[in-house]
């Protein structure tokens, strides 16, 4: 699924350099997954070992924020640039979609639209969560653990439930082709089915742990992921076919950059969505446009 950006502004890159930038790597993909899931399991284990103490609260908060950064895994595997292997891209795409409460069919199509109409109001870019005018209560609730419960009717979980019971939502109607909608509903039912199994397990074992590990992290550990996401397009121009005005590149420390899988180079990503994230810093170097530094939206 290639995104047609012919009508968008694109900075020039030498063809040979661009070819090298687009090279995928199974090694880079597995390295990232090993460190990510290794860190997740480590803090999950520490939370379990200290269960019942205040240390458990701290470790679960860290676990939840790492877990919620599965958004970056979903994104990179969705672009099929995390691995050279199609199988491993699809395998981790399904896992990270569940972790992120993203129904995989809906989000593949809405992300395709996001790249074709970035920050547009018409046709609506459904991936822009914070729009103007901003609902301040909703905005600040995104940063507070369990604040999202106040707006559960707007949550991705509620959207998945609607799809699972056969309701055609606005995003389904505008983004997903008719022939793909049954796939969306079926995968939504799988997600809801897993949620039910986890909830029933918590009830049977009389323990919050299954839910704290698999369902609730996006409610109590979403702070970092929301902060990362806000750097992309919030407060910038809408309805303009130039990513330099609608998208933002920022600079992060190495830990945050890893968790975000280098999507802080977001202008570069939108201009060249086929470049794997591990090469995005190089794409910044290779872009050869004299006026670029003056024109581009950096922070």
Where do the model's predicted regions map?
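Membrane-embedded alpha-helical segments that form the functional core of polytopic membrane enzymes
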Residues: 50-73, 91, 95-105, 218, ...
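Transmembrane alpha-helical segments that form the membrane-embedded catalytic/substrate-channel core
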Residues: 64-74, 103, 107, 152-155, ...
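Post-HEXXH active-site segment of zinc metalloproteases
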Residues: 85-97, 281-284
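Short, surface-exposed loop/helix-turn segments at secondary-structure junctions
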Residues: 240-247
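Non-catalytic, topology-defining segments of multipass membrane proteins
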Residues: 1-63, 98-211, 278-288, 292
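Aspartate-rich (DDxxD/NDxxD/DxxxD) Mg2+/diphosphate-binding motifs
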Residues: 73-91, 119-129
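Hydrophobic alpha-helical segments, chiefly the membrane-spanning helices
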Residues: 296-299
């Amino acid at each position: 699924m290639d995104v047609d950006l012919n009508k968008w502004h694109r900075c020039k890159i030498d063809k040979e350099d661009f070819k090298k930038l687009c090279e995928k790597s199974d090694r880079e993909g597995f390295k990232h997954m090993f460190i990510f899931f290794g860190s997740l399991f480590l803090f999950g284990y520490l939370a379990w070992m200290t269960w019942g103490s205040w240390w458990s609260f701290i470790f679960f908060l860290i676990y939840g924020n790492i877990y919620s950064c599965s958004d970056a895994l979903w994104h990179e595997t969705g672009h099929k640039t995390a691995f050279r292997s199609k199988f491993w891209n699809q395998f981790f795409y399904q896992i990270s979609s569940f972790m992120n409460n993203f129904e995989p069919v809906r989000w593949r199509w809405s992300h395709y639209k996001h790249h074709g109409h970035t920050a547009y109001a018409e046709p609506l870019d459904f991936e822009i969560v914070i729009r103007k005018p901003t609902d301040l209560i909703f905005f600040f609730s995104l940063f507070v653990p369990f604040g999202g419960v106040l707006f559960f009717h707007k949550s991705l979980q509620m959207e998945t439930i609607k799809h699972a019971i056969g309701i055609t939502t606005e995003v389904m109607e505008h983004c997903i082709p008719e022939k793909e909608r049954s796939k969306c509903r079926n995968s939504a039912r799988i997600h809801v089915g897993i949620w039910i199994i986890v909830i029933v397990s918590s009830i049977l074992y009389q323990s919050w742990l299954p839910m704290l590990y698999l369902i609730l992290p996006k409610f109590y550990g979403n702070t970092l992921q929301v902060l990362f996401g806000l750097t992309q397009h919030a407060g910038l121009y809408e309805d303009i076919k130039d990513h330099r005005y609608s998208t933002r590149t920022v600079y992060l420390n190495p830990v945050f950059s890893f968790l975000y899988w280098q999507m802080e180079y977001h202008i570069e990503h939108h201009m060249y969505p086929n470049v794997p994230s591990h090469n995005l810093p190089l794409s910044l170097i290779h872009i050869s446009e004299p006026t670029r530094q003056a024109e581009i939206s950096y922070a």
